[in-house]
């Protein structure tokens, strides 16, 4: 029955040098599954709780409590379970925690076990993870959202928006898309260098130059796309992550928080108008978190304005949570959900969120966190769940490239069955 023989967690380090949780699950057949848990810098207030130790060690960011919860209470309850009982295992941990946001055991403890169990099960069957989770229909390679300029909380650049991304929507295949993305990334480096700007990279591998503002960042990206020999608005589109919750202050969108005196302060309606203006002026296909996570009226305004022609992605808004997504669907707010496994804390709940989104006609985007590891599970999950899009950083830093490289392997393994959706990944006009 492939029973779980042992569960062992340890403290390792993420791409920012902060502690995180890694879990090994061993079966009675000697098979092992391993998963490392990512961590975010800008986190939604409705996310599942990442348990940290506090105190002086690691500036309060240690995860020994979460590790002890895995090695103690969680292991005590799960030893003897079949690794193929994913739903039962996940539900057992949810019940064991007993809180609505996994604050007792920690979402980082629970997720590490959940993903390691799935990997052990796939290894038991000598099957790739994407095939084990997704079955025979798992054949869609995602269109990459490549974060090439970082702003907001991810860099020291004086720009409020957190991420400026490129999407090679008309590539012939995933490998072709990655070629296009890397060429644009390297051309962007040259464009920045020629302007005497910094080419140091931020948390997610994108550049963090001292640009003059949002439009300067967009114009610079257009120049890099053209310099690489591609057509913006046709072969390559732009995606934004505004992370608006990071500069939503006292009911207004206060750009001065990141942009200083030249930044504007906008109401919800003005913010919606500004996003619509940018979308009409530039080849923007996707905007994530253009409004604060609690500004449902603002979200409704921007959805009504541009939701028919721009993908509007809820990250902090939905936090991979079916209850919040359900409200969004009911009120026709946004049209896409960002999927972050550590926002909700189990594989079962992640799958439920993707299924709910797709059944309602919303798109889904599999996503990394700014604090990542060499773990490439989300690459397999993007294919397994046919999300059609993945957001996993720039074309630099091995913690980001690990996911892209895994997708190259999956595409090669799938062969002729591999499907790259191009612009059909978006359900907009």
Swiss-Prot record:
Binds a second Mg(2+) ion via substrate during catalysis. GO terms for biological process: glycolytic process. This is Enolase. NCBIfam families: eno (TIGR01060). It catalyses: (2R)-2-phosphoglycerate = phosphoenolpyruvate + H2O. InterPro entries: Enolase (IPR000941), Enolase-like_C_sf (IPR036849), Enolase-like_N (IPR029017), Enolase_C (IPR020810), Enolase_CS (IPR020809), Enolase_N (IPR020811). Gene3D superfamilies: Enolase-like C-terminal domain (3.20.20.120), Enolase-like, N-terminal domain (3.30.390.10). CDD domains: enolase. GO terms for molecular function: magnesium ion binding; phosphopyruvate hydratase activity. Its cofactor is Mg(2+). The lineage of its organism: Bacteria, Pseudomonadati, Bacteroidota, Flavobacteriia, Flavobacteriales. One of its GO terms (cellular component) is phosphopyruvate hydratase complex. It is an enzyme of class 4 (lyase).
